[in-house]
């Protein structure tokens, strides 16, 4: 079904969106380059997302990122690799992130970030079952490369964080060849992310968060989440994607260095009622290379 929708859409202009994440609060560097190095040590994460499980050609996403501060000069560097697949289309992004941080107060930090990105696009039109022959869908696209740039700003202290970013600024056009060209345009995605950490008591922390994503040609996406952390070990939460899905989240801090997070989404649209749609699943592993010498003075919860 998704493959047929892709064929129908490709005749006109497609507004491509970035990958979707439910556990964005643990994967901020993927959408905001200014986050690179903000954890104060080398941090790496792996994420896998299977969306609309059971539907043929449904989206899947794999993400790897690694970032770290460099010395004591306020500079941070990061590397991200994102692989997206939907129907016959596969996209891979290779990102290099640079950030520079200034102190705004004793606890406050303001970071500015730049992203350099390379994009590889594969479209296997030969895998589609076409009812009618279409000349524009006869030749596969293999490893079509396009560069891009992005930018962001990120502020945080021990309790609060907020960021604004555009991971990909250039609007790349695809499928331009032929006498009657059709296009898929990679649009700018604007992100606003914010959150706070409240101590409800000595053992329970409340962590609300918000992500807003705006892209031309698509509905405004607003994700609101609420997580509760117990004894800085176990995390339980829920989220709502406006007019789209409800989510449940659970996380485990195996140690001060190692986090495991799981999420399940259920659509509230007609797609969620589809008999072959079992929902969306997401898992993230994050490891912080914290020095074993001494104690971590100010643990980060975002």
Give residue spans per PLM region.
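C-terminal segment of classical bacterial N-terminal signal peptides
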Residues: 6-14
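Subset of outer-membrane beta-barrel
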Residues: 16-302
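Sec-dependent signal peptide recognition
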Residues: 1-3
């Amino acid at each position: 079904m998704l493959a047929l929708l892709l064929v129908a859409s490709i005749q006109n202009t497609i507004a491509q969106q970035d990958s979707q994440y439910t556990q964005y609060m643990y994967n901020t560097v993927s959408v905001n380059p200014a986050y690179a190095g903000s954890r104060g040590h080398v941090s790496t994460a792996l994420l896998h997302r299977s969306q609309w499980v059971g539907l043929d050609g449904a989206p899947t996403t794999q993400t790897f990122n690694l970032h770290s501060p460099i010395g004591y000069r306020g500079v941070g560097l990061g590397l991200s690799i994102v692989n997206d697949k939907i129907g016959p289309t596969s996209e891979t992004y290779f990102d290099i992130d640079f950030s520079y941080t200034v102190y705004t107060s004793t606890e406050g930090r303001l970071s500015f970030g730049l992203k350099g990105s390379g994009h590889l696009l594969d479209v296997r039109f030969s895998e589609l079952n076409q009812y009618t022959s279409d000349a524009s869908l006869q030749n596969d696209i293999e490893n079509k490369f396009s560069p891009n740039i992005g930018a962001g700003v990120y502020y945080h202290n021990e309790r609060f964080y907020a960021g604004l970013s555009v991971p990909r600024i250039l609007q790349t056009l695809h499928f331009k060849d032929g006498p009657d060209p059709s296009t898929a345009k990679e649009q700018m995605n604007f992100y606003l992310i914010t959150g706070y950490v409240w101590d409800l008591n000595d053992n329970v922390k409340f962590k609300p968060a918000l992500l807003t994503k705006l892209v031309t040609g698509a509905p405004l996406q607003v994700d609101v989440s609420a997580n509760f952390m117990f004894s800085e070990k176990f995390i339980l939460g829920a989220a709502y994607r406006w007019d789209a899905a409800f989510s449940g989240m659970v996380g485990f801090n195996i140690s001060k260095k190692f986090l495991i997070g799981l999420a399940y989404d259920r659509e509230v649209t007609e797609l969620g009622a589809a008999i072959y749609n079992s929902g969306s699943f997401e898992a993230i592993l994050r490891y912080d290379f914290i020095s074993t010498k001494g104690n971590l003075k100010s643990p980060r919860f975002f």
